Amino acid sequence: MGTVPEASGGEQAPIVAAEAAPVAGSAAPATPTSGLLVVDKPRGVTSHDIVAAARGALHMKKVGHAGTLDPMATGVLVVGFGNATRLLNHIVEHDKTYEATIRLGQSTTTDDADGELLSATLPERWQELLALPVAGGPQSAGENGPVNAAKGSAVSAAKVADDGSAYHPHQEAFLPDCQQLWRDRIDDIIALQLTGSIEQVPNTFSAIKINGQRAYDLARDGKDVQLKARRITVSAFGVLDVRFGYAPTRQLGLPLVSAADGLATTERDDAEATPVIDVDVRVSCSAGTYIRALGRDLGAALGVGGHLIRLRRTRVGGFDVSSPNVITAHVETREYTDRNGNHQSRNRAVLDVIGDELAGKALTMLDAVRGTMPLLAITDQDAVNLRYGRRIPYDIHGTAAAYLPQSGEVVALVERAKRGEAKPATVFGA
């Protein structure tokens, strides 16, 4: 039996379709009848919009995706077509990696930038939070105010204004020592409360079903939505950058620009702007993890609220956004007049490759299962037995893809029946 490591382990290299040597005079590659497209979803369209674009490009109806991405999110969306749609339930269970920006100091109804602003709490809580001990190290009083003994940084209480925001003597800005305290607290809370095996309450505006109805539909109708906590695993939660500045309360979802780009982040141009902290993170986690909920919970633990303003999925199992097989897409806006005479607009997704180029980037059925589960090489007689629903004499663990090594044909998905035997779970036509 030949096997490959399961993609959900997070250690497998990105899946790349095998390339055949070019043959002089050969025809252009035909799009396989079954396989996967790894699409880099753009912001502003739904996952279903990507599926619709794939249906049009592939000229087939049997198309689906493995794991919804919100309209504001970008990144890896694995799209299956033909027989490979039977793999999607397996792919969706793989570990994933995300890059995101969490905005601390503002909370929203949906825990992301698409919701309505609920609160902007950093100014009112500023002095109180600086007085709190930093997890992981005792805090003692210094000459100029509180000192984190573990980190050795001091904060001058005299430089904290009446509204709670911190200023330099000649320029409105967050004090460098305040910034270090915040970074320390963010790191400590992530390490102590948001990493490892944890209980997470999903977001109210989520696709989870309650008595047959989506939670987000109930929430939009004003219903009280109560979701139970779920056990998830966050294997890595790293902070890439922390930026301090001001954001208008009426304008959500615009990340602070790093000072390294030559634009100041600490000037208050708008009287309605409030202090915020933008935290860029990279998270690797199990299936079922809500990155919006991690942002919400980080803000709650700090006592200032938080929401997600940027989300990009960079990996699903062994399918990585850096793979040469990734297909990009763009957004087009369609203007139209509805039956009531009202002017409307709607975004749609368009794949950036079609025809021969699409065929070259599509993963075949064998490439698809190789990135999804272990492989099991079988004989022609084994294939006959599987197609008649019979067991075959192989000792496997979990689910594997049975294939014919000579032709590369994937015959069935098989699972352990008893010691030394495997039984067909899903059989594909010859």
What is each model feature region?
Residues M1-P42, S47-L69, A120, L129-A166, ...:
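Accessory RNA 3′-end/elbow-binding domains used by RNA modification enzymes
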Residues H90-E199:
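Acidic, low-complexity central loop/insert segments
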Residues G44, G82-R86, Q106-S107:
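Short, charged/polar surface micro-motifs in flexible loops or helix N-caps
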Residues S34, T74, D95-Y98:
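Short glycine-/polar-rich loops that comprise or flank the Walker A/P-loop
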Residues D184-L194, V201-P202, V384-R390, I396:
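Phosphate-interacting basic helix/loop segments used at nucleotide- and nucleic-acid interfaces
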Residues K62-V92, T204-F205, D217:
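Glycine/acidic-rich beta-strand-loop module
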Residues A191-R292, D297-A301, R312-R313, G408:
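Non-catalytic interaction surface on structured domains
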